[in-house]
Amino acid sequence: MIKKSLMAAAVALSAVVYFNVSGQTADAPSAKEAKDTKSSGQKAVQQKAEKAAPNRTANAAKAFEKVSKELYPEAKKEGNLIVYSVWDVEHIRAVTDGFAKRYPGIKTTYWQGRNPEIVTRVLTEFQGGQPSVDTILSDNAPSVLRAAGAMASYETVQKDVLVLHDPTLPTVSLQVQALTYNTKKLKSADLPKSWEDVANPKYKGLIALDDPMRAGPLSSMLAGLWTQWNDQTRFNNFIKGLKALNVPVHKSTSAMFRLVVAGEYAICMPALLHDVIHDKEKGTPIDYVKSVPPVVFPRQAGIYAKAPHPNAAKLFAEWLISDEGQKTIDAIGRESSRNDFKSKTSIEVAFPKGTKAIPVTDKLYLEDPKKWLDTYVKPIWEG
């Protein structure tokens, strides 16, 4: 019953995500742009974006203060906030404790689980009519649950400062995927020049590959490349190239990353930017290819359709996106969702100016990752 509900809703509903990075786009550069990245037209666009940025920041701050004053009294009456999240327990505690400190009188509780566990639990509760949870803080789960009709629609008042904006699911953080390598195992001259280059036969035996069929970082990266390339043949050849490397696939990105750090592999396909920077600062032989654009995937604070404390859930989402909330998220090592928030994991700080990040915006992938993988990847990967 749950599976049928997911499939039917995935066809009926649409996911709209807007890529809103100042000075960046999701489109591949044209030949003219590649030859002349300093054209007067581009300079004008960049200058206009930079000039508008302070206004967007100020307007977002005003909008947050206004909605905060409106929501807090109602949220305080509700008295509680219940969060389900895929985040690490210490990370969930950091953001829920920070929220409770900012808004006294609202008690926070949480349950931590993997995305499939969250989806199954929420759908069971939704079909049973249970007002069990307020916020789903995760990456894949909110959009999958939206497709099943289990999420309420809420658009943040701070949308203009978001890198990835979804008009129904507030994006509070980003999963930024970087092409990562062990500096002792691979020289700079031998680095892959692009994500596509990783499938080059010369890297056979050097790559730690995430399982592309488990709906993890590699699968979302593939969804981002699928949209950017818009080329079935090119995409199919890339999957064939990865398969031809004949390397073991890994079920845990963090465990895979540790193997690359230890020198058992030279390349991590892919790794999360905050993990790479964290380990690099500790002096481990790890770095990322800064010339290869990162893939960005939204982490959202979706509101459950039957939330018992809807005002607290809205306030929590707005606080997470606010400057204070983003500082809390940054402190636990997760990437900001704002294009005006500068930290060591910000795209505009961690990558060269003008880097065109690759967003994951595919409708089917966001709503039903398994169906997307079964449609576009499985026939080649397992064929």
Regions found by a protein language model. Name each.
Residues 345-383:
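Extracellular/periplasmic bilobal clamshell ligand-binding domains
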Residues 174-175, 202-213, 238-243, 249-250, 280-307, 320-343, ...:
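Periplasmic-binding protein-like
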Residues 48-50, 65-76, 82, 86-107:
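Short, polar/charged alpha-helical segment
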Residues 82-97, 108-126, 131-264:
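Extracytoplasmic ligand-binding site segments that recognize negatively charged/polar headgroups
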Residues 142-147, 266-286:
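A ligand-binding cleft/hinge motif common to bilobed small-molecule-binding domains
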Residues 178-185, 222-227, 297-312, 328-329:
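A bilobed periplasmic-binding-protein/Venus flytrap-type ligand-binding module shared by bacterial periplasmic
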